[in-house]
Every structure is written in C-alpha cells, then in structure tokens.
Regions:
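Helix-biased detector of long, well-ordered alpha-helical tracts
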Residues: 1-179
C-alpha cells in the first residue's frame, strides 16, 4: 500500500523504515516475509535504511519515503471539472479474495488463488504513476474501494463525478460472481 500511495502521487519511492515486533519461533514466517519485502523493494529501487525490532505479538509498521520534483506531486485535490476518471487494472479481486478466505463466498480453485494473490500481493503501479506525472491532474490509490476513494478525491477537489459502473474493469472471476 505504501508503494501504491507513492505511485498515486507520481513519486519515486526510495527509502523504507521497518519497525516490528515478532514472537519467538516465528523464523519461517520472518524468512518468507523478508524474501517478499526485499524482492518488492529491489523491484522498485527502495532501500531499507532503518527501523526497530523487538519481541512480542506480531506487529509491523513500514514507512516509505520517496522523491518528487518540487511542485510536481499529483494530489487528490487537483481534479478539475471535465476531467476523465480512469483506473488501472481490474477492481474488486482483492475484496472477492478476502470474502472467499473468510468463507463468505465460494470460488473455483483458480479464481480463489488469483483473487487471494491480488489481496496478499497487490501490484503497485509505480511506473505508471511516474509516467503520469505532468499528465494527470489528480490521482489516488483505490485499495480501500472505488466508491470511498473516489469520494475522497471529489471532496478534496471540490468537484463531482458520474461513474459508469458498467465500464469499470473487472476480472472474469468477479463478473461470474456478479452474474
């Protein structure tokens, strides 16, 4: 989510601080987490520059800092009347994956795996955010849901919007569930 927030501002992520508490005997979990963290950090050029660790119930806090040229940050408050509203990727897969994991819905094995992956390993669109710097008037990460997050953008920008829900890109798994 931190990387997606950076992407939504057109910022280049650079540094990370990780603070955490881990219980004794959590070595396998820590090894898997570390592999994932370093793979994602390496993919986006982020260096882990500090933090703190202690023993206790598992609790992690990751902070990412980055760079954007002065005056070039893309803010939620920049939308203007007449702007188009775009999304990247399909929406709803993480929510559907969580519902399947919690037993609130059923999915076939392939759809369950794909949607769970979108929940557990979201794809930050850092390159897209950088490419849209100077082009987009406003951006935000919609990981909290399209309706709520677009509402934040509209409120901050003092504009309204008409959203054609039929045009929102969805995965086949979500389309089948909605049918």
């Amino acid at each position: 989510v931190n990387l997606s927030d950076m992407a939504a501002m057109g910022a280049r992520p650079r540094w990370a601080l990780l603070a955490g508490a881990l219980p004794d005997g959590d070595d396998a979990w820590l090894a898997a987490f570390s592999r994932g963290l370093y793979a994602l950090a390496g993919e986006h050029g982020v260096e882990l520059v500090g933090g703190d660790t202690t023993r206790g119930p598992r609790n992690l806090c990751l902070t990412i800092a980055g760079e954007v040229p002065a005056g070039a940050a893309i803010l939620r408050s920049g939308a203007r009347a007449g702007d188009d509203l775009w999304v990247s990727g399909t929406l709803g897969d993480a929510m559907l994956g969580l519902a399947a994991i919690e037993g609130r819905t059923s999915l076939d094995a392939a759809a369950r795996a794909a949607c769970a992956a979108r929940l557990e390993r979201p794809t930050p669109r850092v390159a897209l955010g950088l490419a849209l710097r100077g082009v987009a008037s406003a951006m935000l990460d919609v990981s909290d849901g399209l309706t709520g997050d677009v509402g934040h953008l509209l409120e901050r920008s003092s504009v309204g919007a008409v959203v054609d829900l039929a045009a929102v890109p969805r995965s086949g798994a979500l389309d089948r569930k909605l049918a």
